[in-house]
UniProtKB/Swiss-Prot annotation:
Protein name, per record: Uncharacterized glycosyltransferase in aroQ 3'region
Record-linked SUPFAM superfamilies: Nucleotide-diphospho-sugar transferases
GO biological process assignments: mannosyl-inositol phosphorylceramide biosynthetic process
Domain of life: Bacteria
Pfam families: Gly_transf_sug (PF04488)
Gene3D superfamilies with a match to the protein in the record: 3.90.550.20
Native source organism of the sequence: Actinobacillus pleuropneumoniae (Haemophilus pleuropneumoniae)
GO MF, any single term: mannosyltransferase activity
Family assignment from sequence similarity: Belongs to the glycosyltransferase 32 family.
Keyword terms of this UniProt record: Glycosyltransferase, Transferase
Entry EC no(s): 2.4.-.-
Record-linked InterPro entries: Glycosyltransferase_domain, GlycoTrfase_DXD_sugar-bd_CS, Nucleotide-diphossugar_trans
Amino acid sequence: MANPVKYESLIVVCNGLERLFGNIVKVISYPFHALFPKLRFTIPEYSPAKIKSKQNTRITKTIWQTNYSNKVTLPVYANYLFNRLMSLSYDYRYVSTEERETYIKENADTRTFNAYSKLTDGAAQADFWRVFTLLQEGGVYIDIDGHLVFPISQIIRENDQEVLIKRRDKYTNFFLACEERSPS
């Protein structure tokens, strides 16, 4: 059963303002990348939590993201920085295409790894990896171009086992959070 959303009106306002800011960054990035066409920013593979939280949660305090490369344009990097600001009490992990395959090979049984290996589309591989990793490790998955609209410490509650987002009455997959559910 879904829990009521805390601060729902404030979250809606914040989301609108953040989208406006994001669009401004995108507009600015066009002339920026016209002047510096080869310049890319590096998203770190690991960034530890910046503050220690006293809040204990069932959901692991790790943000997971994946992309074909951690060398990104200004808008994607600005989005990463904004998400870090909204998740200061969480570790951050970026996983590349190659690292996704290595992780699944090291942590899955042969049947599961073979199923992953048959996927040829990068988006399908990322979908498989995100669900597999969340079940193994727990934590929060956010698409590389997705943004948090409110501090994650205010979204995930102490006893939440999973947090999913609905948009127009349908569940999305750009944000998924769950506790570790490794098979025993």
